[in-house]
Design a protein with these regions (language model features):
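Short amphipathic alpha-helix that is part of the acyltransferase structural core
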Residues: 1-37
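Short loop/turn motifs at secondary-structure junctions and domain boundaries
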Residues: 40-45
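Short hydrophobic/aromatic beta-strand or adjacent loop that forms the aromatic wall/cage
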Residues: 47, 140-145
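Residue-level detector of beta-strand face positions
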Residues: 49-51, 114
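Conserved beta-strand in the GNAT
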Residues: 51, 57-67, 78, 83
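Active-site beta-strand termini and strand-to-loop segments that position acidic
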Residues: 53-55, 147-148
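Conserved active-site alpha-helix within GNAT-family acetyltransferase domains
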Residues: 107, 111, 117-141
Length: 150
């Protein structure tokens, strides 16, 4: 398995189609942002889309962004759009992407990464800790987690 950056890939059309295959509304939203060329404008210049691949197959994806749907906030950077295809769940593959996000964040001078979700018990097994509740841009309450980088 290999972690690649969508924007650094020479196979963007293929990986965009793979993201579109996800059965998740946020995956469709992400692919739409990519198609429109508005991902970076929405989430910040240093934002990345990370893909865990096995040959031509997309196993998992997630993002590393300066901003998230929790605004306004001083918290940065964020990991989001966390998804693993159903046939690959249960193997903790997303941890490989989280490790890459931690490496990038540390290289960018950060000591923590944040995550907005309503899942309970999923991200804790990757070392994320509940931080607080905040409202997203639609006014809906979201759990904010912090992943400290040591």
């Amino acid at each position: 398995m290999q972690v690649i950056s969508y924007f650094d890939s020479d196979r963007k059309p293929h990986w965009l189609e793979e993201i579109r295959r996800s059965d998740w509304r946020a995956g469709a939203f992400l692919s739409n942002l990519i198609s429109k060329g508005s991902f970076v404008n929405s989430f910040g210049e240093k934002s990345k889309i990370l893909l865990l691949t096995e040959g031509d197959e997309l196993i998992s994806f997630c993002t590393y962004t300066e901003k998230d749907n929790i605004q306004p906030t001083e918290l940065t950077p964020w990991m989001g759009f966390v998804y693993t295809f159903p046939e690959h769940r249960g193997h903790r593959y997303i941890g490989k992407l989280f490790n890459e996000i931690e490496r990038i964040a540390e290289n960018d001078g950060f000591h923590a990464v944040y995550l907005s979700t309503n899942h309970v018990g999923l991200y804790e097994k990757y070392g994320c800790e509940f931080l607080t509740q905040m409202n997203d841009m639609d006014g809906k309450s979201s759990r904010i987690y912090i992943k400290r980088i040591y």
